[in-house]
Amino acid sequence: MHSASVTKKSLFSAAVCALLAAAPAKAIIFDEAVSGDLSNNKAAPTALTLTPGLNSVIGTVAGFPPEGTDPQDWVSFTIPAGFVMISYVNSKYDSTDPQGFTGFQFGSAFLGDEFIEGSYAGYAHFGTAANNPDGNPVSSSTVGVNLLPLMADPSFAPGTTGFTPPLAAGTYTFLIQQGNPVTTGYQFDMNVRAVPESGSSLCLLGMGGLAILALRRRLGYLDRRIR
């Protein structure tokens, strides 16, 4: 009975370890071309739950009226228990305007004035030639860049309430904005991973269990040979 119990636990732990080590899944969790416009209401953002691996959101924003028609996309991301969001990458940007704006707040809705720095936990301009308030007068491309560490840097995003990456389990409301009346296409990729401690413990448990199982079988084999 004890041997069977060890076997089951070992195999289960090894399977979990293999899953954690496998290549991360990739999924487009929202594409405005397929699912329609993301919410324009900060009090009721489009609610999305992130899954382990890469989660992509694709959309467009097009400036404030009267010349523009769709300046803001509001979306809330929920990170499940036991996981963290390790990156927020501006993977694509297509616009005649060199930059847009993105920022987030803790919670399932955005409270306060989105035009005040103190309403955000972190923010950044993004685009092919983005200017950010970090003391650097030279604009730079954020395409392919993980924005989370920059958004958490008070010299890069001054006046915010602050946060420490990675983002822990919970819900966060993000704004993606283009203030000028030009159509701006974007893609953001959120990478979600298991909390490192949990993964390490399961892997160690699996390897330890398999080692015990192998030893028991080896001893049993030697015992039969001796008899």
Predicted regions and their residues:
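Bacterial N-terminal signal peptides that target proteins for export
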Residues: 2-12, 199
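C-terminal membrane-anchoring or membrane-association module
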Residues: 213-227
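Acidic, Ser/Thr/Pro-rich low-complexity intrinsically disordered segments
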Residues: 60-158, 167-171, 177-181, 192-194
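Predominantly extracellular/luminal regions of secreted and cell-surface proteins
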Residues: 28-52
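A short, hydrophobic C-terminal helix/tail in secreted or cell-surface proteins
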Residues: 197-216
